Amino acid sequence: MSPNPANPTDLERVATAKILNPASRSQVTQDLSENVILTTVDDLYNWAKLSSLWPLLYGTACCFIEFAALIGSRFDFDRFGLVPRSSPRQADLIITAGTITMKMAPALVRLYEEMPEPKYVIAMGACTITGGMFSSDSTTAVRGVDKLIPVDVYIPGCPPRPEAIFDAIIKLRKKVANESIQERAITQQTHRYYSTSHQMKVVAPILDGKYLQQGTRSAPPRELQEAMGMPVPPALTTSQQKEQLNRG
């Protein structure tokens, strides 16, 4: 007996639904939605990167002591997926902790170039960012590591606390989450993450590099000499008398 096309059975309806392409939008079943995750390649790639940042152990001054404190149980930076490495070929993050000298600059650039892409840099401490207390009269300190390699996050302080390093890691993870695979060939500094717009007031520099020309450098003050029983040079006594006459 041939099937009646006017009254199709349930089996025929199911078979027809499987063969024909329905005009309506296909519905995702509950089983499929619970077992399949829909995402993009960029999101998956960035998630894998930001969850396993491997920093290179690089320290040249006292700031590295604060970074070494993160390895202990009090701060435990392993919960961020940070695994310290001693080889630049196994690291994708370098934290420049300490002063960078002219002699160390070529070695730092070589370490950065040996790191595989994608790679990131965190400048930790005032000496790394601007030269710090060595920026006024030092002939060997580099005034900013960003003159050598591109920097993603800056951590000011002398030295910064371990909590500040965690804050920098979180900001770097947010920066990594917004990247795209198409930008891997771009070496310029893009997509920097700024947390706060600071309203800084420009003031005159305290260290102008002219303190060697001050009179107290050539001879101590007269009060100090008298208190310590130091002999007062005649030239200094004459100059002080002239200053008193000019004032009077």
Swiss-Prot record:
Residues 228-248 are annotated as: Disordered. Keywords: 4Fe-4S, Iron, Iron-sulfur, Membrane, Metal-binding, NAD, NADP, Plastoquinone, Quinone, Thylakoid, Translocase, Transport. Binds 1 [4Fe-4S] cluster. InterPro entries: NADH_UbQ_OxRdtase-like_20kDa, NADH_UQ_OxRdtase_20Kd_su. It is a peripheral membrane protein. Residues 236-248 have a biased composition (Polar residues). Gene3D superfamilies: 3.40.50.12280. It catalyses: a plastoquinone + NADH + (n+1) H(+)(in) = a plastoquinol + NAD(+) + n H(+)(out); a plastoquinone + NADPH + (n+1) H(+)(in) = a plastoquinol + NADP(+) + n H(+)(out). [4Fe-4S] cluster binds at residues 62-63, 127, 158. Its main location: membrane. Its cofactor is [4Fe-4S] cluster. PROSITE patterns: COMPLEX1_20K. Residues 1-2 form a propeptide. GO terms for cellular component: plasma membrane-derived thylakoid membrane; respiratory chain complex I. Its EC number is 7.1.1.-. One of its GO terms (biological process) is photosynthesis, light reaction. NCBIfam families: nuoB_fam (TIGR01957), PRK06411.1 (NF005012). NDH-1 can be composed of about 15 different subunits; different subcomplexes with different compositions have been identified which probably have different functions. This is NAD(P)H-quinone oxidoreductase subunit K 1. The lineage of its organism: Bacteria, Bacillati, Cyanobacteriota, Cyanophyceae, Synechococcales. The gene is ndhK1.
